[in-house]
């Protein structure tokens, strides 16, 4: 049983956090009667040991009263001199404003989060310092530094020097990145040099001069008993029968003709005496062979027998 009043004498009803009336008992479950006046700003109540004596101090407000589960205003009310009855010392349990109120402010948490986030953000500056300006791959890495293909293209000018228009030099220049394409205009020069072998086959032969004496010599040599005129400007070999007929029919006349030609040839030679002897000796051997053949044939006699 609690008979509590405020400073103006109004009764104060003890309830729990849900507004339900609270029955005060001691540690053995016996009802406890509390009387007192609540005043503002008092932290220690009027200690009247009352019925329970000093041994039952602090059970009411601490265990089941408004202090238990008190938040804010309820804690402040319970911390006043409400427990000035027989259960003294209850007022010291002022848990309200100190435990739950502003004392538990998030200064530490707020400061910690704010400071940590700021420092981390500035340190990890991935923007312009990390990737932006440092990794300038564009102009320095691939652009002008790798423009060496054009120089190689100019060095390999195979067109005008090597073979001519067949190579032309233009294909070699295209191996660059496009910067040296116009420089390799060696096509015109290659055509001029390459046309040098065009004079092949223009060999001229001096006309062969023939004298009347040379023609006579050619005819005399070609009119031997081994060949005859084929009617087309050439010579063909005589048959054995044709040779015998010539020797039998007009052999004497032909032999005289051969002797005359041989004599003419020896007269125009550089050494007439020696050449004439050699030819006449050759004709003499031919006559001996023919005379022998005629002697073997019936009805004919050797020219030497006449």
Swiss-Prot record:
Annotated stretches, region: Disordered: 1-57, 80-171, 188-306
One cellular-component annotation, GO: cytosol
InterPro entries: Dehydrin, Dehydrin_CS
Name of the molecule in the record: Embryogenic cell protein 40
Family: Belongs to the plant dehydrin family.
Biased composition (Gly residues): 85-119, 127-151, 159-171
UniProt biased composition (Polar residues): 12-23
UniProt feature, compositional bias: Basic and acidic residues: 205-218, 243-259, 279-298
Record PROSITE patterns: DEHYDRIN_1, DEHYDRIN_2
Compositional bias per record (Low complexity), positions renumbered to this chain: 32-44, 194-204, 260-278
A Pfam short name: Dehydrin
Domain of life (superkingdom): Eukaryota
Paired cysteines (S-S): none
GO biological process, one term: response to water deprivation
């Amino acid at each position: 049983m609690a008979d509590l009043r405020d400073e103006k004498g109004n009764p104060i009803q003890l309830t729990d956090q849900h507004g339900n009336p609270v029955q005060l008992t001691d540690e053995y479950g016996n009802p406890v009667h509390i009387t007192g006046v609540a005043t503002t700003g008092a932290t220690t109540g009027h200690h009247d040991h009352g019925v329970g004596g000093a041994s039952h101090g602090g059970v009411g407000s601490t265990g089941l009263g408004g202090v238990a589960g008190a938040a804010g205003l309820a804690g402040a009310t319970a911390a006043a001199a409400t427990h000035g009855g027989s259960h003294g010392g209850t007022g010291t349990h002022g848990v309200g404003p100190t435990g739950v109120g502003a004392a538990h402010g998030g200064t530490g948490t707020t400061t910690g989060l704010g400071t940590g986030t700021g420092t981390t953000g500035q340190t990890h500056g991935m923007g312009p310092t990390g990737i932006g300006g440092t990794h300038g791959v564009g102009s320095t890495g691939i652009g002008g530094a790798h423009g060496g293909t054009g120089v190689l293209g100019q060095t390999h000018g195979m067109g005008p020097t090597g073979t001519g228009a067949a190579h032309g030099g233009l294909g070699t220049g295209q191996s660059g990145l496009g910067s040296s394409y116009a420089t390799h205009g060696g096509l015109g020069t290659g055509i001029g040099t390459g046309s040098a072998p065009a004079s092949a086959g223009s060999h001229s032969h001096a006309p062969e001069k023939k004298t009347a004496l040379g023609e006579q010599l050619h005819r005399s040599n070609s009119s031997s008993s081994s060949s005859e005129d084929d009617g087309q400007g050439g010579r063909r070999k005589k048959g054995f029968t044709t040779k015998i007929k010539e020797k039998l029919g007009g052999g004497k006349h032909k032999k005289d003709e051969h002797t005359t030609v041989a004599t003419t040839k020896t007269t125009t030679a550089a050494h007439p005496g020696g050449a004439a002897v050699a030819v006449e000796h050759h004709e003499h051997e031919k006559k001996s062979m023919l005379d022998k053949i005629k002697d073997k044939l019936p009805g004919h006699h050797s020219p030497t027998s006449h």
